Amino acid sequence: MIETLIAGLTCGIATFYGMGDGFHGQRTANGERFDAYRWTAAHPYLPMGSKIRVTNQDNGKQVIVRVNDRGPYSHADLDLSYSAFAHIESTHKGNATVCWRVVA
């Protein structure tokens, strides 16, 4: 994990979940059903419902996601839903160097 914090900006590695792994339709940590096609995220400690702007550091693409789950349970710092990750990086790559900031 490379998670670093600079003046409210956190950087690290993002991965995705919800496609082909059995999570789509399952309950998230806040009790709602996980939808791989909504822009959501799993984070270990940000408050549920927080909205964060995630920026891919390689291409500048951004997505705003809502934290609705806990995790990640991999080597990453942030787990994005399949759709949110696909908006900022090819899912074939599997991970991305990102920075994020709470916006709401």
What are these regions (language model features)?
Residues 2-104:
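Secreted/periplasmic proteins
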